Amino acid sequence: MNPSTLPAPPLAEVYDVAVIGGGINGVGIAADAAGRGLSVFLCEKDDLASHTSSASSKLIHGGLRYLEHYEFRLVREALAEREVLLAKAPHIVKQMRFVLPHRPHLRPAWMIRAGLFLYDHLGKREKLAGSKSLKFGANSPLKSEITKGFEYSDCWVDDARLVVLNAMAAREKGAHIHTQTRCISAHRSNGLWEMNMERADGSLFSIRARALVNAAGPWVAKFIRDDLKLDSPYGIRLIQGSHLIVPRLYEGAHAHILQNEDQRIVFTIPYLNHLTIIGTTDREYTGDPAKVAITEGETDYMLKVVNAHFKKQLSRDDIVHTYSGVRPLCNDESDNPSAITRDYTLALSGGNGEAPILSVFGGKLTTYRKLAESAMAQLAPFFTQMRPSWTAKASLPGGENMTTPERAGRRHPRQIRLGTERDAPRRWATTYGSRTWRLLEGVQALADLGDHLGGGLYTREVDYLCAEEWATQPQDILWRRTKLGLFTTAEEQDNVQRYLSKVGQTRAKIEAA
């Protein structure tokens, strides 16, 4: 059936807000809007966080290097958001100290001290410790010629889970979240948006909405141009960022921020107890955002930066995994990809009887919540009964009544000490927080967790992720929601595929009966 011939749904199915895109900005806006009493529909053509939002450096940070580009508003907002997100989701956001080795020929010490002074004082800081100078001794993992440096605080986050938790928060406030669902066309009609949707199985349906939010990330301009047949108010620059994952590079829970000769920086970040993330790069990208992959040049670049700083030398043979994403930045005509603003721009059109559309250009993981508040402020004139902002103090799912993940492991020890792998209870706590008890509801013995598929993953957890977190494919579970893809064999990953296929066949038989 041609989308243009799809019948419009009855008026009872009109939503206040329809959101295109299941990345961090889309789900953040959906949650904010739903919590203000608006009816919300969100569609994502793939899985939640399946592109940019799961390919970040996994940091909640002010952006120390943005100070060099005079982005004081963005840095101030991001610094304040660190503490907000620490309180909202303590199971997936944690404090982290960052060590900055001093290389005098790149940036003088006074410049770094001035930047760190601003970093300490621009934003509200209660939980995070301030910066200080360091001297490195013989036990330092850094090369012997690097004798001094600095240390400051930022935060680490499980980026994909941050997206999923916001989607769950939106659903718990009444939003309808549809993954594997693509908006194939939309047009204005009688003061509403009429939107045509296609599910992964090819089935079609339509909805109507009073306002449309385009949070399609790398596809934001393409959606306006190709699916809405309108002109995009801004251009988009796709900047590729790639990362390496290697075995743990050094002891300790601190990250390093490494200065390079080209004035860029590269992070080394402790990851999942046994690994280190290295990244990121900045390069223009012109291909399909869904097919981005690390280049040979990026790999060599990051290895060279790390090997210039650390005693332990890395080669390609040390690489466990790589991942890449594209950052959809608002085109500010900068010649240097690293200098393009990471701030967001919201473009609103409509009014005077014409249904509004709000498009999101740019943005960064750290400031998604403030972006959502700004989006709702722009839409407020169209929804005069909308309730006030609410997300600053509200916990995300799993963060309720928690201060640290360790609390989850102490609350009901009988429930999680089941003879499973030693790391399983802590992994559950740092993945699901206080929602671990929903995962383990009724579990009294190891057998209640179902079959072991590999890497500490049991069928009970797979069932939970499918029922509660929109997981449908092995990669949704292994790479975005649990990260167990890094610790499972190809055969074990096939076990997950076989189990999902079996469950799907059983469900299909029940529905057909």
UniProtKB/Swiss-Prot annotation:
GO CC annotations on file: cytoplasm
GO biological process, one term: glycerol metabolic process
Cofactor: FAD
Keywords: Cytoplasm, FAD, Flavoprotein, Glycerol metabolism, Oxidoreductase
Enzyme class per UniProt: oxidoreductase
EC assignment: 1.1.5.3
One function term, GO molecular function aspect: glycerol-3-phosphate dehydrogenase (quinone) activity
Localization of this protein: Cytoplasm
Catalytic activity: a quinone + sn-glycerol 3-phosphate = dihydroxyacetone phosphate + a quinol
Main location: cytoplasm
Protein name: Glycerol-3-phosphate dehydrogenase
Gene symbol of the encoding locus: glpD
